[in-house]
Amino acid sequence: MGRVIRGQRKGAGSVFKAHVKHRKGAAKLRAIDFAERNGYIKGIVKDIIHDPGRGAPLAKVAFRDPYRFKKRTELFVAAEGIHTGQFVYCGKKAQLNIGNVLPVGTMPEGTIVCCVEEKPGDRGKLARASGNYATVISHNPETKKTRVKLPSGSKKVISSANRAIVGVVAGGGRIDKPILKAGRAYHKYKAKRNCWPRVRGVAMNPVEHPFGGGNHQHIGKPSTIRRDAPAGRKVGLIAARRTGRLRGTKTVQEKEN
């Protein structure tokens, strides 16, 4: 079967440790407190910074602690249109303005939001990548649930108490600009993880990959492989139910949750 292939070598390594040395910190909403539940709290955008390994910029927002005589600085995912010196309001009674943080239950239907909480108090999990946004579709006052459309197109029912930032995540259109040079890809993935460059299996020799070898680059066997194949052969489309392009009239697959 030849050498130990790339997939086997990856499995034998240590547990992946993220490249976080130069990162600025975790982008989260404020920890929910009495001020946000019943009124609002005012903060000011001190700085908009780049975070290595992340497409979207981050906003440093300074809040006055409602319980102690000190200031707290939070890192928010920056919404498009915010600027340094802008006041940001967080809470149930905050106004519906770009950059403010409100519960989705208080927002009108059709509102564009980002950094949405999946569960109340988890400080933002959905629609956080650059240019992404979710849309508030409908409210159910009886069950206190809100339906939102996620960037993938799927629709999700979440609690109306979940908070979100009003607006679209900044940095949209980032992937429209082509990388053009290998050097740019090198620096991009150096900040993220060791997954570049990736040599294709058909470009290898037969000892290095099941798809390697031949007088021209071709797989020479089915690209699908059974689930219980040995590790050195388990490459390609593993236990694929189907292959090929999805054809038909259905463009957005709506998942009902």
From Swiss-Prot:
Cell location: Cytoplasm
Pfam families in UniProt: Ribosomal_L2, Ribosomal_L2_C
Domain of life: Eukaryota
GO molecular function terms attached to this record: RNA binding; rRNA binding; structural constituent of ribosome
Keyword Membrane: no
GO biological process assignments: cytoplasmic translation
Keywords for the protein's UniProt record, in alphabetical order: Cytoplasm, Ribonucleoprotein, Ribosomal protein, RNA-binding, rRNA-binding
Functional note: Component of the large ribosomal subunit. The ribosome is a large ribonucleoprotein complex responsible for the synthesis of proteins in the cell.
Annotated family: Belongs to the universal ribosomal protein uL2 family.
UniProt protein name: Large ribosomal subunit protein uL2
Gene field: rpl8
